[in-house]
Amino acid sequence: MAFDSFDIKSLIRPVIDFPKPGVIFRDITPLFQSPRALRLVADSFAQRYVEEDFSHIGAMDARGFLIGSIIAYQLNKPLILFRKQGKLPADILAEGYRTEYGEAFIEVHADSLCEGDSVLLIDDLIATGGTLIAAANLVRRMGAKVYEAAAIIDLPELGGSQKLQDMGIPTFCLTQFSLTER
């Protein structure tokens, strides 16, 4: 199935003034309601990474789990879950970050990675980059490296992809939106 960025964009619902006034939230749930669109998204990522040399997939809580788990299954890679604060039961590492809405913490089990591991980080969207930057810092604290940061959507005007690239982390997104695009 050939990737069609327009087809994907047409299924991402803009929700005006959510979660606060002035924000256009990019709702990806319609992608998951369409088997064709979900297959298109999953296959696009799988085809990009099928022959690449990394050891783990790291998925961001919560929407990153949806696509990250599919890709981990398709590529037969271990899946590392980067969770919101207070959700993991064992020893954790935590990292604070700023979002477009405020401040938050992301956590990962301290034994998730070993020195020398290489991780593909996956999320639904790159906005300010806060979540993925925090996850990258956690990966590095465990002695591993970030192979690439990937998402379905990029909001380049918020600078997250550029911040990741400035850290030496390549980025890949299936589509992008301007902040005012509906």
Swiss-Prot record:
Key words, A-Z: Cytoplasm, Glycosyltransferase, Purine salvage, Transferase
EC number: 2.4.2.7
Reactions the enzyme catalyzes: AMP + diphosphate = 5-phospho-alpha-D-ribose 1-diphosphate + adenine
Pathway this chain belongs to: Purine metabolism; AMP biosynthesis via salvage pathway; AMP from adenine: step 1/1
Domain of life from the UniProt record: Bacteria
MF annotations from Gene Ontology: adenine phosphoribosyltransferase activity
Subcellular locations according to the entry: Cytoplasm
GO CC annotations on file: cytosol
GO biological process, one term: purine ribonucleoside salvage
Cross-referenced InterPro entries: Ade_phspho_trans (IPR005764), Adenine_PRTase (IPR050120), PRibTrfase_dom (IPR000836), PRTase-like (IPR029057)
SUPFAM superfamilies with a match to the protein in the record: PRTase-like
Pfam families to which the protein is assigned, alphabetical: Pribosyltran
Role, per record: Catalyzes a salvage reaction resulting in the formation of AMP, that is energically less costly than de novo synthesis.
Family named by the database record: Belongs to the purine/pyrimidine phosphoribosyltransferase family.
Quaternary structure and interacting proteins, as annotated: Homodimer.
Protein name: Adenine phosphoribosyltransferase
Gene name for this UniProt entry: apt
